[in-house]
Amino acid sequence: NVCIHRMPLEQSLIRPPSQCPKCRFAIPWHLNMPIISWLMLRGKCKQCAEPISPRYIGVEILTGLAFLACWLTFGNQSTPGVLLAVTWSLVLAGLITATFIDFEHFIIPDEITLGGVALGFLVSAALPSLHEAERATASLTASGLGILVGGGSVLAVLQLGKWFFGKTRVPLEENE
């Protein structure tokens, strides 16, 4: 939720602490626990009683269920399974964040997409078997080619759009 709220506003994800958007009450840690706090406060700010959007508890439940599904699918296996569970949890958290930001602002922050690309590349080195490879170098090569083809395809579509329509619909730079 903090990512969904702050990333489009280009605010720090760490500071300042969470606060009520209406009265600016700084939410202490014990009132900022996923799901539990929303239920304890009956969906209202402790200070001003302003309703807290049900989106908050919905995102928390959705993310929790996604993490649970990843753990149940991969986590009970050996070390590679735990790494897969953590990796898929991060990927799903990024997708959930991107989806809700896109619903509200019609953007997907580069930090999410490029972070996912970097995560995929690093996991390829740690788990070469994802690319049906025995060595990390073969897996990294496959991952790198995937990045080049996928990224190149996006850039090609953007360039074609610019040629045909005179503008790009998905800017990759802030001043474009």
Task: Kindly label every feature range from the protein language model.
Residues 1-176:
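A membrane-topology feature that recognizes alpha-helical transmembrane segments
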